């Protein structure tokens, strides 16, 4: 099929049906510590009843990009189960799918995915011979945002680029965590450096850098060529940002797509929303932000819905027998929760949580199937799945005491509590892997 380069001649349907999306979902997220010991970062819970990967997948479906492969590797069981139960609704007879592409050591018997580029390279035979796309959209499965990818795809074809990278303006003080680029007036990338120690500023904006979002659109044939070159390059990191994009830049084939062009669901001030929830502080803050009256991220927006696992829990119920107990305030409550004479404020509670009488939960993110006993006080906490908080326990009240028992975030503000930590406090033998570091 011949795609004309004039925007008026471009047909969105033709573009999306000839595109394949690859969601890279194999990362651990080591800065989240024990939260990702048993689950990949994209499988981590978010927003009361969703997983992080649901945002990328919902963006695909809302963008009419219904040919999706999810590349998995680290601790993939919960992620694969979520994809099977929540994302198997596309009609395969129409060529639509969410396929799982786990690491299978396809190149030889000893090598798993060695980087983002290698993850795609190891699946290249399947992509070329089975999916046969004309365009390939590659994105990370561990960011929180809403974007119409079809707009980025349209811009890619319009520009004549071989590779297009999504970009966003970030504070220069934070840009060392990203690939940073400079572009000309036509958005052609003129310079690119991955995670620089001293990030360059944008022209006229000394405190702002233009950062890569880790989202790429490639002409499929061009991507195959670049990956074949990359795998045979000595001392390669097998990484798109470090290895592939600089080669695209050398060939003059790299263009940028500003996120502002395709962002969906701006807030009332017109601000765009994109978060890398890669630390305990950012994960906690991004969840807590949702409880405000007008949050930057609107999870109730039906014009751009964020789908998830359709399994329905029973309704939550609340018992308040004592008038001196302050009830639920400014909080998100999942399904199947039972709250009895407990005070909950500025918190996000996921499904199937039980909180007993006279406990206080403030500015907490509580993951599913947690039990909180009587007379507990929890402040500024992330409570991992299946924790049982004993009667009278106080967390977030005495930080020096908490440092001896739990994981404290790098800012010293957020406390992570897991079931292993609680079992150690109770004196249970849980093996060497349960020791705190």
From Swiss-Prot:
Pathway as given in its UniProt record: Glycan biosynthesis; glycogen biosynthesis
Which reaction is the catalytic activity of this chain?
A: alpha-D-glucose 1-phosphate + ATP + H(+) = ADP-alpha-D-glucose + diphosphate
| Gene Ontology BP, a term | glycogen biosynthetic process
Q: Which SUPFAM superfamilies match?
A: Nucleotide-diphospho-sugar transferases, Trimeric LpxA-like enzymes
Q: Which Pfam families match?
A: Hexapep_GlmU, NTP_transferase
Assembly mode:
Homotetramer.
> What protein name is recorded for this chain?
Glucose-1-phosphate adenylyltransferase
